[in-house]
A protein has these predicted regions:
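Alpha-carbonic anhydrase
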Residues: 2-271
Length: 271
């Protein structure tokens, strides 16, 4: 695995702030808070994937400057000829959860999980707990320039606040799909939440194959904070065409274009 760039104080603070915002609905907290949990006086501006889309994110707010100036941005085009390092495998330890809370946050459909839910990944011997997962359409990552129908990002946080994301590519195909219980009841109105009773087996959302791409990158939405450990599973998972259409009716497109690698290495592990 290539040596990663050390975390910069401002970068890790931005990552923590972004994760704090992501988990607010699950924690039941009110108001906007900064990385320390104190009320924040700075309110991030509106952004989207259209007029105020990826090409303009850095112009919307000082905290979004990394979206333009960063050198380890995500998503990326994953090379099919990536260096094979089977021992660099990210361990995925997923099980069922009793319930999830779905929220339409105006950018995607996000599923927030209860704390201490027992689902985690282990990256370089560091455990990361699953906090939430959300969707993009079409996929954000591509492989040799080819994308898929959708992509789901499972967002994890370590005990020290570092962030690791597991990306799963989704391809529309007939038949059963582990995403049906989520996408079939996604809230249509912004800022509306709905509780999905379980059990929900997260393993049904993963491919059977274990090949995975690993690289160092960033959040794919503002503030685009870097220092994020990425694992993208190489084999797509089926999503029912009707469920993809339901999501498309809410968000016709919700993907950031691929970003330059800028000399970063991509490792193919677990193959």
């Amino acid at each position: 695995m290539p040596t990663s760039t050390p975390f910069r104080p401002r970068s890790i603070a931005a990552v923590l702030a972004a994760v704090a915002v992501l988990v607010l609905p699950a924690c039941g907290s009110g108001g906007q808070r900064g990385p320390t949990g104190e009320p924040s006086t700075h309110h991030a501006p509106h952004w989207d994937y259209d007029a105020e889309g990826p090409d303009h994110w850095a112009d919307l707010d000082r905290d979004f400057l990394t979206c333009k100036s960063g050198h380890q941005q995500s998503p990326v085009d994953l090379p099919g000829h990536a260096r094979l390092e089977p021992h660099e495998h990210t361990t995925v330890d997923y099980h069922s959860v009793p319930t999830v809370t779905l929220r339409n946050n105006g950018h995607t459909v996000q599923a927030n999980l209860p704390t201490h839910n027992g689902n985690r990944i282990v990256v370089d011997d560091v455990p990361f707990e699953l906090v939430q997962f959300h969707f993009h359409l079409p996929s954000e990552h591509t492989v040799d320039g080819v994308g898929t129908t959708m992509e789901v990002h499972f967002v994890h946080k370590s005990a020290t606040g570092q962030v690791a994301v597991l990306g799963v590519l989704l391809r529309a195909a007939p038949g059963p799909s582990g995403f049906a219980p989520i996408l079939s009841v996604a809230p249509r109105a912004v800022d509306v939440e709905t509780v999905v009773p379980g059990p929900i087996d997260l393993r049904s959302m993963l491919p059977g194959a274990t090949d995975q791409y690993r690289y160092q990158g960033s959040l794919t939405t503002p503030p685009c904070s870097e220092g994020v450990s990425w694992t993208v599973l190489g084999s797509p998972v089926a999503v029912a065409p009707a469920d993809a259409d339901r999501y498309r009716a809410l968000f016709s497109h919700s993907n950031r274009p691929t970003q330059p690698l800028n000399g970063r290495s991509v490792t193919l592990a677990g193959g």
